[in-house]
UniProtKB/Swiss-Prot annotation:
Family stated for the protein in its record: Belongs to the WD repeat WDR24 family.
Polar residues composition bias: residue spans: 661-681
Species of origin: Dictyostelium discoideum
Quaternary state and interactors: Probably part of the GATOR complex.
Record GO terms (molecular function): transferase activity; zinc ion binding
Binding annotation for Zn(2+) 2: C972, C975, H994, H997
Regions of compositional bias (Low complexity) in chain numbering: 563-578, 682-695, 760-812
Annotated protein name in UniProt: GATOR2 complex protein WDR24
Lineage: Eukaryota, Amoebozoa, Evosea, Eumycetozoa, Dictyostelia
Amino acid sequence: MNQMNQPPNKCQTYLNLGSPLSAISSSPDSTKLIVAGRDIVKIVSVQNNEFKVTSNLRAGKTQSLNYTGNDCCWHPSLLENYRFLIATAATNGAVVIWNTVREGSKSVERVFTDHSRAVNKLAWHPEKLDCILTGSQDNTLRMWDIRDSANASKITFSPKSESIRDVQFNPSQANQFAAAFDNGTIQLWDIRKPTIAVEKITSHQGLVLTIDWHPEEKNIIASGGRDRAIRVWDFSNGKSLNNVSTISSVSRIKWRPGNKWHIASCSSIVDFQIHIWDVKKPYIPLFSFTDHRDVPTGLIWKSPSSLISCSKDSHLLLNEFQDSYKPYQHIRTTGITWNVNNELASINDKINRTQSNESLPSLSTQFPSFFASFNVPTPPPLPPLVKVEQGIMNIYTPKYQNSEIVYDEKYLFEHFAKNYRFRGESFNQLCDHNQFVSQSVNQHHISTMWSLLKLHYSNLDEIQQHKELIEQQQKEELEKLNNKKIEKQQPQKLKKQQQQQQQQQQQQQQQSQQQLQQPQLQQPQQQQQLQQPQQQLRQQNDKNIKEQQIQYIENLENKQLDSKNIIDNSNDSNQEININKEDKEDEEEDDDNTSNNLDDNQMGDIFDPSNDMMTAKEPPSSSLMEFNANDTGNDQFCNILSAEAVTPLVSLPTSISLERQKSTDNISDNNSNVHVNIKRQNQPTNNNNNNSNIDNLEKKSNKSKSTKENKESSLTDQNKQKRNDNKEKIDNNEIDNDNKDNNDDDDNDVDNIGEDNDEINNNNDNNNNNNNNNNNNNNNNNNNNNNNNNNNNNNNNKNNNNDNNNNNNINNKKNKIKNKSIENKKDILDKKEINDEDNKSNDENDSLKILIPCFEFEEFNFQPIITDMLEACIEKGDVQTCVFIVLILGRYMDLNIEKHRLTTWFGSYIELLQRYKMWSLALEVMKYCDDQIINQASKRHTTLISACSSCGKSIPQNSIICEKCNKASSKCSICRLPVKGMWVWCQGCGHGGHLEHMKSWFIDKNQKSCPTGCTHICTPFKK
């Protein structure tokens, strides 16, 4: 049903006293009021909700400051001698006791003037009826006895603080009172201990202007201060129970009777309204009285539904709740909440905000005399009445067909902490599992991180296994070495034992020989007979060794004839020898260049312009390679190839060509360091090098003599003849040996053939060089020299023909051996090529072209991206993902992250786990962290705080008895005796006892509940 807020009826009671009011107090029977101000002290009767002034206590008195009313208080007793007593406090520090029965000047009974400054508050003792308590600006509290006029101040309290703003006796304990101070503290005093305060609470930031004890709850007091707050305190523990924020400073507060947590307040400035608050709902007041035109100064509850107030606007008002402004009725009721399914429910009142046509009467028309009494603008009208309809509740869910579930941060943290893994599986499995966990809660950016880690570091497990295998092999090798050492040591011990046994046997034999009576001459004869055949064998071996040495010396003499002849003629032809040395050095350099060019051409890479790729050429086949085992390398004309026959090309080194080159090198190494010589047919000679040598000779031959040249030519002819004779002998011997051992020495035969052919070519080159040199010399020398040169030419031609004939005979004899050796060599190379290429098929027999790119990619460094990724997670506050990535990758590599940063990451994550009470997960992270600071944190900072099982207060170390309840905290719940040693307790209820007693109770007797009878189930239910 639609309901309308009705306007307030004319039910207010007010009284204009003509002067600003400062305080108000009620009689014990609530029929009269005492109102005090700067210029008035009057008694007002309250009958039928109407105010009437019955007496003026200041009538006919002089304008003395003793009679000004800064505060007033009616005696709370109903006894005849006390119910008419009234006390007032003046601004000059005087305290006046009034008797309302008397009239005129006799109404003043006592005047106390011990305070030096203004008295702010008065309070009668609830039990000692003749005593009154005062608080002053002079920083003292005084207890007065109204019966003693000479020395009335019986007790003086010196709190050593600032000015006292308010004092009140505790209704539950008459000997205690509370005082409010300007320094923001509230102190609890006992009149029996006037030297020191019992309790002190710092309640406000600034002045504490008012306090009020709760009428029902013990030790609970409310305070209001200049910091615009109302606070509720419990003096038993000094804790703040509630806090109400207002818009201005609070000058007076008063608990509402009949309503436990309702309290009224008024302000000293700005706010002229009186508010009634519910301290459990501190944001909006329940009721507000808006009739005063100036700040209220006093509050008295006449009943739970009516409030009497005075103000500096000189008015005394009786406020009824039915006339009050109710903010809750003028605001829209709204409720909002979440459920477990992430659904949002809200409820709102449907309000019709259309204005009603009826205009509301103003308060000035209702109370003309009230508003005409002072020049105050008329108050604004109340908010317009609004038609309220029935509330509407709406339920919203973020889960639609095309939307995703929204997860709370707390839920995500707990979900990841419980489901993430960092050990027990391989790297790829851990990444897959963590990716699935993050994807199940729609955290796609985190799942992408795990997938990237798996994509780049997919081979970490294989690398780790390889390292472990290497470590195992090293360990096994060390064990073998140790075992060998042990085995070597054992035979030494055995040898020592055997030697000792032999010595013992020899001693026994000597003893036995002495006992024998046979002659000793027979024994040397027998020994001589045994030694004769051994001497014959030694003599034969010595003869064979001498014959071999003689043959070896003869061969050396034949080979060193050239060098001896050259040394004999060295003193006569130093210049020519130097020329020959320079020629030899040039020729050796040419040989090196040609050999290098050949290697580059045959083993290097050739650019193929058709496909812009590099083709790696196959190593030369076995038919083009011959192994010479007898090549000594002493001849300077061996292994010379013409530079014109080779066209050097720029080669790009590739990994595949290098691997093939290594494979061919391995083949040559396996053949006992055999020199490789490459045969080439129809190669033109390099005339450039020869021409350069000829030019050098022409420059230097002018200084030489013709006789020296003739001697040199004759020496060379003799040396060549001796060389050829030696070669024929060596080759014939080799042929005979090859016929005997064809199957074992095929490789050496082929190499010998290659050597013979190379020497033929070298001899031809030497003859040509001699011819050229002789022709040049003919131009500069005499006719005698010409004849000598012609003779040399003829001799050279004859020698060449002899060499060719000898070599042809040798080649004819070795054709069969050569064919067999080549076939065997092909088989060996084919097998090794198959092993090197990992059983790959060859498309071509002569050469295999492999496509290789012209450039190589550098290895991509993924580690800086990982560090940036971790830093981005830290900036988002996701320390959890960073910790798990470090735990997983840290086992395989060094992440190059600063140690103190890792310590802060792990420390933050462990602290979060401990806040969520995930103790086991926090300890697991500590255990497997590589940082020693984190790993040993549980060992250094593990503390156990015990609490009393009866009151719950913590017990200090090395103490058994609780300080609060004075009970032994370690009593057994079954035997009720103190426990010394092992203590077992339930973490739910805190009860425990001896280990044996707990076992007998829960295991033997099969009990589930606590033995103390606290109804707690200490053991889980069994399914």
